[in-house]
Amino acid sequence: MRSPLAASSSPEQGSFVAVLGHNGCGKSTLAKHFNAILLPAGGSVMVYGMETKDEALLLAVRQHVGMVFQNPDNQIVSNVVEEDVAFAPENLGVASQEIRQRVDDALKAVGMYDYRTYAPQLLSGGQKQRVAIAGVLAMQPQCVVLDEPTAMLDPQGRREVISTVTRLCREKGMTVVLITHHMDECVGADRLIIMSNGSIVSDGTPEKVFADAALMEREGLTVPETTRLLHDLRKAGFELDTEALGVDACAREIAAALKH
């Protein structure tokens, strides 16, 4: 079976793709096919031109696509932050001087450089997840897949992680695939995919997808508060664009509507 995302179209390099859906819809199963944690029962999954079922290419596939999981404690293997980030490149046989540079660059990229000598258990959940992301970045992948990375975090931790991955995409040109069931985490994505029962039921910009009220209701998904407000105002007779996302865009749209 081919990946439903691959069957639709591949993420563009440097883009931010969010995959949204309820538990059991298949989004985490999809994520695990990207770097060959799971293999297709039939057909093939191609990652950067490499077939994931080819054992000789397994290391190369995982160097191209890094994975970040729900629980950062399951990815942290060392007692010092910088040693943990160095773990993957060391196993890849990267030269010591190069490892030092990669570790420093990765920790700076996620805003955790000042914590490089800390013990991971002294960090908050959001900080631990950022260290886990740094560990993936040290492998210098072309794509990072995050499988519900904020599921075990408090609101502050969630904001830290989403802000970090968004910045990596925008400033570093890294492809990001975010698996989530939080609607608000998808607002800044370039592309939003809704999955249900193992299939894609919608694929477009967040503005277009969230504006489809019938789809969201059918899938039992709650749209962002700003989108719901715009829909309610439109039903009340105001002429405005229901595709505006985010507080600032929503405020501008309402202000423009009130002038007419």
Where is each model-derived feature located?
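Helix-to-loop junction immediately C-terminal to a conserved catalytic motif
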Residues: 35
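Catalytic Walker B motif of ABC-type/P-loop ATPase nucleotide-binding domains
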Residues: 144-147
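Conserved ABC ATPase "signature" region
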Residues: 97-115
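The feature captures the beta-strand-to-loop junction immediately N-terminal to the Walker
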Residues: 20-22
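Conserved ABC transporter NBD signature motif
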Residues: 43-53, 61
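Conserved ABC ATPase signature
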Residues: 119-123, 127
